[in-house]
Curated annotation (Swiss-Prot):
UniProt keyword Iron present: no
Molecular function via GO: GTP binding; GTPase activity
Record localization: Cell membrane
Residues binding GTP, per UniProt: 14-21, 62-66, 120-123
Family statement drawn from the similarity comment of this UniProt entry: Belongs to the small GTPase superfamily. Rab family.
Residue ranges listed under propeptide: 196-198
Protein name (Swiss-Prot/TrEMBL): Ras-related protein RabH
Name of the coding gene: rabH
Topology of the protein relative to the lipid bilayer: Lipid-anchor
GO biological process, one term: vesicle-mediated transport
Keywords carried by this UniProt record: Cell membrane, GTP-binding, Lipoprotein, Membrane, Methylation, Nucleotide-binding, Prenylation
Name of one Pfam family that matches: Ras
């Protein structure tokens, strides 16, 4: 019998213009765009990754400007397995606002949803956010923290793969005998339209 791939739903949140879409394009296409031009609204990206010999189907939602108007709602967070909370390392306010985003995610996302704090634009010289403070903040919340650069492809893939691995560990997936994924995931995936990249 052919074994179904594991299916996971992820999203990436944070203030407008912190580099969320650039992280997605680097992870999915291994390209960098200074400015992405997605239309307003949710956009779905799909990718299959191989972890420990198992194929994992990822569906990742990009807010595509919705966060600028704080228009994310309960349905956006429903059924998520993992969340990347992103700030711009050259903008202190965007880091301070990760606390608001984390609070929102804790209220609206499933209780077992894994979260990671992500610094973007690590290639910039004008870093203003103290990495030690962020690391201490993340450690106190028992969250992992990555510094990334979409432009220079620093830690981007590692961040996403770590999130996926932590989700699988949290859900106690056994890699050698997985025959079925979480209930209703196949139906949800098939209903979504968007950017499909393998």
């Amino acid at each position: 019998m052919i074994k179904d791939n594991i299916k996971l739903k992820l999203t990436i949140i944070g203030d407008w213009n912190v580099g969320k879409s650039s992280l997605l394009y680097r992870f999915f296409n291994d390209v960098f765009y200074e400015q992405t031009k997605l239309s307003m609204g949710e956009h779905f990206f799909y990718k299959t990754v191989l972890i420990r010999g198992e194929s994992i189907d990822l569906q990742i939602t990009d807010t595509s400007g919705m966060e600028k108007f704080r228009s994310l709602n309960n349905s956006f967070y429903s059924n998520l397995d993992g969340i990347l909370i992103v700030y711009d390392i050259s903008d202190q306010e965007t880091f301070e606002n990760t606390k608001l985003w984390l609070n929102e995610a804790n209220k609206l996302a499933p209780k077992d949803c894994i979260k990671i704090i992500v610094a973007s634009k690590f290639d910039l010289e004008n870093k203003v956010v103290d990495s030690n403070i962020v690391k201490s903040y993340a450690d106190n919340l028992n969250l992992k923290f990555f510094e990334t650069s979409s432009k220079n492809s620093i830690n981007v893939e590692e961040t996403f793969i770590t999130l996926v691995e932590d989700i699988l560990l949290k859900k106690n997936y056994q890699f050698n005998n997985i025959t079925k994924n979480k209930n209703n995931q196949d139906e949800d995936f098939n209903k979504k339209k968007g950017c499909s990249i393998n």
